[in-house]
UniProtKB/Swiss-Prot annotation:
Family annotation (PROSITE patterns): SPOVT_ABRB
Lineage: Bacteria, Bacillati, Bacillota, Clostridia, Thermoanaerobacterales
Record gene name: mraZ
Family: Belongs to the MraZ family.
Keywords noted in UniProt: Cytoplasm, DNA-binding, Repeat, Transcription, Transcription regulation
Name under which the protein is recorded: Transcriptional regulator MraZ
Amino acid sequence: MLMGQYEHTIDSKGRVIIPAKFREELGEKFVLTKGLDNCLFVYSLDEWKNIEEKLKTLPLTKKDARAFTRFFLAGAVECEVDKQGRILIPSHLREHAKIEKDVIFIGVSTRVEIWSKEVWEEYSKSTDVSFEEIAEHLDNFNI
């Protein structure tokens, strides 16, 4: 399971070190794509195959399904870790996530999220206030 939080800095070429714990789980190759809430999602190749299968089941006749599939797949790239443990985050994905320098990696069970440090701090502040309320809404899921 992917979990934990790590901070790294992106270099001038758009490369960033993937935390060793996450590299162990993800493997040497994985998929990086646009995520929700202005972050990036990182999936192992096996998990990505599961997601592709689920996306194939979405009805082509539904506008929201088409839009989500386009959003999710259009920005997706396969990444390979270099000898220094880094990946290159393409400019279109850096722009989507507002990544300029400092990034936060977060393990979220089956995926890693990559956030701009500034965006993550804003998001964290906004959810800290409502964390208890969110937990109450999740009561039906026996968490």
